[in-house]
């Protein structure tokens, strides 16, 4: 996270920031903080591109888009310690996922934002399978 803080504090005008797997080796709490820094960079006008396998990053982005337009946004920002620089307009975010086809090839698929944010089927399917196993394996 320190390099991102340095970028924000430096005042240097970057054309863009591209980061592969920014969540690598980070606890989910730090992933959320790192995502907050990336959003701050975006709100400073720095285009940010990331690749991720982190549902934590995805959910934080969704939360910040939802909070931006929430009817109680100011109240919730105070309650949870966010500032306007931490929030995102839905139209400022684009998400894609790689999807395998039946021919063994992979193609890029644009994801549409719902009123709850972006839904990533490849993440959700894996998480649902894990939850299903948890319940099955806990049965007596």
Per-range role (PLM):
Residues 1-137:
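Switch/communication elements of ASCE P-loop NTPase nucleotide-binding domains
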């Amino acid at each position: 996270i320190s390099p991102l803080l340095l970028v924000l504090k430096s005042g240097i005008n970057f054309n863009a920031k591209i980061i592969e797997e920014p969540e690598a080796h980070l606890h989910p709490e730090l992933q959320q903080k790192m995502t907050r820094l990336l959003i701050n960079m975006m709100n400073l006008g720095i285009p940010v591109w990331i690749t991720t396998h982190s549902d934590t990053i995805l959910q934080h982005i969704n939360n910040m888009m939802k909070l931006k337009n929430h009817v109680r946004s100011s109240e919730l920002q105070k309650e949870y310690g966010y500032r306007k620089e931490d929030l995102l307009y839905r139209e400022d975010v684009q998400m894609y996922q790689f999807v395998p086809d039946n021919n063994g090839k992979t193609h890029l698929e644009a994801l549409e934002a719902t009123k709850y944010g972006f839904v990533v089927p490849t993440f959700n399917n894996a998480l649902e399978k894990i939850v299903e196993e948890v319940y099955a394996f806990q049965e007596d």
